[in-house]
């Protein structure tokens, strides 16, 4: 018998997806003042020559870098870095011209931050142009900043209604959700990842400093995976805070035809032309009832997931990446019918179209007001079709045994922009000039 006592969560509170006009005006006014201070300083520094020093025959991790330019943005197929932050913003821009300025500025800053360089110096009577938390040298540190846009950006403010991706929608409540209005939605979502927390925080502060009249933080959450998993560059599956491997069934990045089908919007998808090369991003903040879970017998934990806790192998099998054969277990005697892995991926020809690429991170925020540990999973996944992938899978998962131990409290649906071809282009250019 499972202990039914566990953390209590408040009811879902309906909220407006976009920031209210009055709040936007207030923040905009504040931003223009601070923006004047920033613009009074020196121009943006040019990226320095970031040659990799020879450190004991291996590259210093601080100098690791991911390409900024390309058909797709980095941070989707990139092997997971150790540190991550999700930051949702409300856009303060009031017209399309200002919105274009925002995305050009984001492109400029991200190109610099992901390359690295020397922090610029200014007159000491002016605010410094860099926070200084990384010292005088800004290392790339494997930084990626993946930019996505929310459903609300396609409202009447910028005249983009006709360019909205077909499947993009406001995240609605599932039966087990207890959504906090302050942790949902956003006009722009940044997924910031790097080797270290310092680099992630530095990137966020740089972006905020340079966009005071254009962006306002709506909510943020910081996540992590083990250093061992990060250094494996995708070879070792991260372990979540319930003690189980998370992401075992991901499609292999090396299988390019499969990845192109699962992750990226293609020319024949019926989407707006600008969206080709982008991806639908799902973000879910999922709180774990870890005290409750830690009192649950191991056998029950394993039947809930359908996997061995140590090896990650499907029950009745030996290795993590062994594929379960549900046809030989039609009554669920080995892997229960309501096991997480069986519901999420039934392994049929029909359900192959429901695949997605997961890129989740753990989070830990201290304790709740009731004295319970506030920790869980920052679930992030990418797919070429939101309805066919995440939404379909989540419908199958409704009512699963795992729901007793987890509670989604926030997040949103976003569209990850196509990549930037080169230094002559900018993020969202094909959308804004469509």
Curated annotation (Swiss-Prot):
Annotated signal peptide: 1-45
Post-translational note: Predicted to be exported by the Tat system. The position of the signal peptide cleavage has not been experimentally proven.
PROSITE patterns given in the database record: DYP_PEROXIDASE, TAT
Main location: periplasm
Keywords: Heme, Iron, Lyase, Metal-binding, Oxidoreductase, Periplasm, Peroxidase, Signal
Protein origin, superkingdom: Bacteria
Record note on cofactor: Binds 1 heme b (iron(II)-protoporphyrin IX) group non-covalently per subunit.
Any one cellular-component term (Gene Ontology): periplasmic space
Subcellular location(s) per record: Periplasm
EC number from the UniProt entry: 4.98.1.1, 1.11.1.-
Co-factor requirement: heme b
GO biological process, one term: iron import into cell
One example GO MF annotation: peroxidase activity
SUPFAM superfamilies (UniProt xref): Dimeric alpha+beta barrel
Catalyzed reactions per annotation: heme b + 2 H(+) = protoporphyrin IX + Fe(2+)
Family (UniProt): Belongs to the DyP-type peroxidase family. EfeB subfamily.
Subunit structure comment from the entry: Homodimer. Part of a ferrous iron transporter composed of EfeU, EfeO and EfeB.
Described function: Involved in the recovery of exogenous heme iron. Extracts iron from heme while preserving the protoporphyrin ring intact.
The name this protein goes by in its record: Deferrochelatase
